[in-house]
């Protein structure tokens, strides 16, 4: 079962496609999601250790909702990835494991956010350009030569099941820069 697979793993990273907060902020977009904080311990019980927030719905309850979501994830015993008090914090690689090698997660949203004014000094999800991601991967590889670098990219288009030529090209550039997966 998926449950036994997750429990047999030291680390399980999942994409959390909604804010998990009691905060309700008015946002103007087509689909607005929100989950209850009480649901998070269930994810932890089923083996989830890290939750990616660099996606197009983590900001669905505004900036306060995003920050609260990070706190709720921590309270439930998991680690949030890909969001922060500002872009610098949101884009910071997260150390997943130290043994036998360092494993780093680098997360970024690669889609435009609907009706959201992106302000890099305010709470946000990581939303870096490919060139910025390439530089981040190269810097990480240069400082930690024997590590594994996992990229968590939220990209693609709804109901399309194949990568676009541009996504394939970008993926190859990131691999060439030093990303492992």
Q: Where do the model's predicted regions map?
A:
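Acidic, metal/ion-coordinating pockets
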Residues: 1-181
């Amino acid at each position: 079962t998926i449950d036994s697979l997750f429990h047999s793993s030291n680390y399980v990273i999942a994409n959390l496609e909604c804010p998990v907060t009691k905060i309700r902020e008015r946002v103007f977009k087509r689909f607005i999601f929100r989950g209850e904080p009480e649901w998070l311990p269930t994810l932890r019980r089923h083996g989830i250790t890290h939750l990616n927030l660099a996606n197009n719905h983590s900001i669905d309850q505004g900036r306060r909702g995003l920050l609260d979501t990070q706190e709720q994830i921590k309270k439930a015993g998991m680690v949030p990835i890909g969001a922060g008090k500002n872009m610098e914090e949101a884009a910071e690689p997260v150390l997943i494991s130290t043994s036998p090698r360092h494993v780093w997660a680098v997360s970024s949203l690669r889609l435009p956010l609907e009706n959201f004014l992106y302000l890099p000094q305010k709470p946000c999800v990581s939303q870096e350009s490919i060139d910025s991601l390439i530089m981040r991967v190269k810097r990480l590889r240069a400082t930690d030569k024997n590590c594994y670098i996992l990229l968590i990219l939220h990209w693609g288009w709804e109901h399309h099941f194949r990568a676009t030529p541009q996504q394939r090209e970008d993926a190859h550039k990131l691999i060439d820069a030093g990303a492992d997966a």
